[in-house]
Amino acid sequence: MRCGPLYRFLWLWPYLSYVEAVPIRKVQDDTKTLIKTIVTRINDISHTQSVSSKQRVTGLDFIPGLHPLLSLSKMDQTLAIYQQILASLPSRNVIQISNDLENLRDLLHLLAASKSCPLPQVRALESLESLGVVLEASLYSTEVVALSRLQGSLQDMLRQLDLSPGC
C-alpha cells in the first residue's frame, strides 16, 4: 500500500489548517488610516480650500454631499460615485486619490463581509452621464467641488466608523 503521500499530508495538516484570519479591528484601523491619508492628500492640493463642501454649485448637483448617517453600502456607493468623477478628470492631482478610493472600497467590502452583509456591485450611475458636458463647461470648478465634498464625506465616514455602521 502506498501511504507516503497520505502520511506527508497528515504530517503537514496542522500547518495547513492553521490559518489566522485578519482581525476585523485591524481592517477597521486600516480603513480609518486610509481615510486620513486621502484627506491629507486632498488638503495638499491647495485650490481645494477655496470651496465649502456644503456650498451648492449649479450643474454639479450630481456630486454627493454630506450624509449624517452612513451605512457600509451607502459609503461604498458614495465612494464609487467619487471614483467615477475623479477618473473622468484630466488633472494629475487626483490619480492617487482615485486609486486610494479603490483600496478604501475594498476595505469597506471586507468590513461588510465580516458583518455578513455583502455589498451590491455599484454600476455606472445615470446622473454621471452629463458629466462630460459639465467638465467641458467648468473643469476646474468640478475638481474643486468634487474634492471638497469628498473630503467632507470622508470625514463623515471616519466618524461613522467609530460607531460601527450597519449594512
From Swiss-Prot:
Disulfide bonding pattern of the chain: C117-C167
Signal peptide: 1-21
Localisation per UniProt entry: Secreted
GO biological process, one term: lipid metabolic process
Keywords: Disulfide bond, Obesity, Secreted, Signal
Top-level taxon of the source organism: Eukaryota
Family: Belongs to the leptin family.
Protein name: Leptin
Organism listed in the record: Capra hircus (Goat)
